UniProtKB/Swiss-Prot annotation:
Lineage: Bacteria, Bacillati, Cyanobacteriota, Cyanophyceae, Nostocales
Keyword Hydrolase: yes
GO biological process: carbohydrate derivative metabolic process
Species assigned in the record: Nostoc punctiforme (strain ATCC 29133 / PCC 73102)
Keyword Hydrolase included in the entry's annotation: yes
Name the record gives this protein: N-glycosidase Npun_R5314
C-alpha cells in the first residue's frame, strides 16, 4: 500500500513540512521545517537579509512565499545541498516529537508519497510520476530512527 500525504489537516499531515512541529537546529528554534528549509536557501547569498524575515514568518505559507520569491539570489550550492538540508530538518522533527515519530514508524515499510499536484521534485506532481524526494527522505528517516531505536534497545 502507498501512503499519500500533502495537507496538514489530512491523514498523515504530520509528514508535511508545514505541520506545526518546531525544531531546534544550530542553536535556533524554527516554527516548522518549512521555515528552516526556506531560510537555508539564502545562507551566504547577497539576499541573506531575508533569513530573519523567513524565521519570523507567522505561518509556513508565509515562510514559503518569502523563500520562493524568484527575484532573490539563492546560495550558490543550493542544488547540491537542498536534499541534505531537508533530511537534517525532517530527521530533527521526528526525533524531537515522539507523537509523530510513532506515526512515521507505524507506516512500516509502506511507500510514502507527497501528493503535491504542483511539485514534481519533492512530491509526485500532477502526473504522479514526480521524483518524490520528500517521501524518499521520510522513508530514509524512518529507517534511521528504527536503527537508532534498535541500538538504544541493545544498550539499555
Amino acid at each position: 500500500m502507498t501512503i499519500y500525504f500533502y495537507k496538514v489537516w489530512q491523514p498523515y499531515g504530520c509528514f508535511s513540512n508545514f505541520s506545526p512541529h518546531g525544531i531546534h537546529i544550530q542553536d535556533t528554534y524554527w516554527a516548522t521545517v518549512e521555515h528552516y528549509y526556506q531560510a537555508q536557501k539564502f545562507v551566504g547569498s547577497k539576499d541573506a537579509a531575508i533569513i530573519p524575515l523567513i524565521h519570523a514568518a507567522a505561518t509556513p505559507e508565509e515562510a514559503a512565499a518569502l523563500g520562493r520569491c524568484s527575484t532573490r539570489q539563492l546560495r550558490r550550492d543550493w542544488d547540491l545541498v537542498k536534499t541534505q538540508i531537508m533530511r537534517e530538518a525532517v530527521l530533527k522533527k521526528f526525533l524531537t516529537h515522539a507523537d509523530i515519530r510513532e506515526v512515521l514508524l507505524k507506516t512500516g515499510d509502506e511507500l510514502l508519497v507527497e501528493n503535491s499536484p504542483t511539485d514534481s521534485f519533492w512530491g509526485c506532481g500532477a502526473n504522479k510520476a514526480g521524483l518524490n524526494h520528500l517521501g524518499k527522505t521520510l522513508m530514509s528517516v524512518r529507517e534511521e530512527i528504527r536503527n537508532l531505536l534498535s541500538l538504544t534497545g541493545i544498550y539499555e
